[in-house]
Amino acid sequence: MSTMRAAILETTGLDFSVQELQLPEPRAGEVRIRVAACGVCHTDLHVMKGEVVFPQPGVLGHEVSGIVDAIGPGVTNVAVGDRVVSAFIMPCGKCRHCVRGLEDICEQFFAFNRLKGQLYDGDTRLFRPDGTPVAMYSMAGMAEYSVVPDTDVFVVPDGLPLEDAAILGCSVFTAIGAVRNVAEIRTGDTVAVVAVGGVGLNLVQVARAFGAEKVIAIDVAPDKLELARQLGATHVVNSRETDPVAAVREITDGRGVDVAFEALGAAQTVENAIAMVDDGGAVVLVGIAPAGVTAGLNIAHVVRRKIRILGSYGARARTDMPLVLQLAAEGKIKIGDLISERYGLDDADTAFQRLARGEVLGRAVVEPGR
């Protein structure tokens, strides 16, 4: 029996146990990837803290890059040896949402993977040596190998470092969905990004890539604001020192922004985002909140000022990942500059502990071969 190493979340908490699992086998329409890198994301952190319900034991990690190691029957879009990346939303391609082009809310992904830790035949691909199943969060990228549906495997262009490409599958992918598909940013728009962590920084650079004239980055961390400026923010606001709503109003001559992106998932930042948009503007909620978190809403203000409040959860893998890869290959979005820390599999929990303390600038990645 062939095995691999994986960082397993045995129970709620910020510690992984690196153990041997059976080498996963791809079934029909599936691809096995030898993982080069996996991004360290707040969404996984919510699972670790118990703020998002997910079966345990499980393997987390939902943005990966690597080399195709094996393919199942019927796979034609990639070949063994290809350098590939996968997005965190793995579309089934068959449910009522997927057939309408709404792969970002694929029913099977939520029903099987996010709730049960399985792929779409109702089974995980991860098993302990004794045959005990282990849940998969997306493709379970915190491991040496990962099995992914072929609907979610995309060839990485030559010239893009494979380890850096991992973050395209969530933090950049999520930003593309919010900016392009939900907000529909147009040339000349003014934008605020509330919270510039891994996703927020990409909202900054993607908004600029799609023509936003002013991009106001808002955070409490000076180093994150400085990186946001380097990635294209025209203005930065430290909300620990300044009222962010008043600052945005001042920057926009009292009007407010056309679009405010909220990338933290906290009640106060959501309320601030709503308060800083112009009449007829849009608030796009991107940050994942712990279960049960609610925010206050001034209904009369929203109605009278025709403010749109929109949710955005990722993007459409088969439609949008090719665009993500093109923008990265052309240098219109930067990925290497966003990765500040790299860890081996044995130190994956250290990466998440630092993320929990707010110490990661941009994005950290875990490289299982490191």
Where do the PLM segments sit?
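Residues located in well-ordered beta-strands
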Residues: R5-A7, S17, Q22, R34, ...
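Glycine-rich beta-strand-centered segment in the early N-terminal region that forms part
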Residues: P24-C38, M48-V99, D104, F112, ...
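Mid-domain Rossmann-like dinucleotide-binding core that forms the NAD(H)/NADP(H) cofactor-binding site
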Residues: V80-R83, E144-Y145, T151-V153, P157-T242, ...
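Glycine-rich cofactor phosphate-binding loops and adjacent beta1-alpha1 units
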Residues: A183-T187, F210, V220-P222, E226-R308, ...
